[in-house]
Amino acid sequence: MTVERLENGVIVQRNTNEIEISITLDTVHGKLEGSTGVNFFDHLLNTFCHYSGLGLRVSTCESKDGILHHLIEDFGISLGLAFRELFDYTKVRRFGEATVPMNEALVGCYVDLSGRPFFQKNFEFSVEKIEDMPVEGFEEFMCGFVNHARITVHFFKFFGKNDHHISESAMKSFGLAIARALEGSEKKTTKGVID
């Protein structure tokens, strides 16, 4: 994996026996450009970009073994690393939270840019796929992102039956929580450092 810093962004390239990914994460555009080849995953990524205010350009996203699990997980790894490289967690608010309704679904997201990776959600999906994306991809993406961004993320589903609505409500709340966590702050961590 290679990382290249830009003025307002980071390029991450990841090439394994399973996938080839090249992405740019920036603080400017606030939208998704390009495609992962998985339509519903693109929809979730674009939702995250819109609500977080971050820009994501997908230059390359190819599966060498045809297994979507690998592609989605490795995309999360690449995006998480780009996020960690782009931001100094000691110079931002660090904590963020948001709860977002979407029709019958209501999901909250709670974020800490702590340097300590942890992911938890209190819901499971009731179907195997949402559109063209295996539902396990949601958790695989989030775990890849969280572990390499080195952040803590909790999702709490208050209500919801439709898996499309639940996942989109979750991603909207994640984007908003990240945007709030990235707000500037003079308040320092009590420990004095974030590893």
UniProtKB/Swiss-Prot annotation:
Q: Does the keyword Lyase apply?
A: yes
Q: In which pathway does it act?
A: Amino-acid biosynthesis; L-histidine biosynthesis; L-histidine from 5-phospho-alpha-D-ribose 1-diphosphate: step 6/9
Pfam families named in the record: IGPD
Q: Which keywords appear in this protein's UniProt record, sorted alphabetically?
A: Amino-acid biosynthesis, Cytoplasm, Histidine biosynthesis, Lyase
Q: Which reaction does it catalyse?
A: D-erythro-1-(imidazol-4-yl)glycerol 3-phosphate = 3-(imidazol-4-yl)-2-oxopropyl phosphate + H2O
Give the protein family. Answer: Belongs to the imidazoleglycerol-phosphate dehydratase family.
Recorded protein name is Imidazoleglycerol-phosphate dehydratase
Tell me which species this is from. Answer: Thermotoga petrophila (strain ATCC BAA-488 / DSM 13995 / JCM 10881 / RKU-1)
* Gene name tied to this protein: hisB
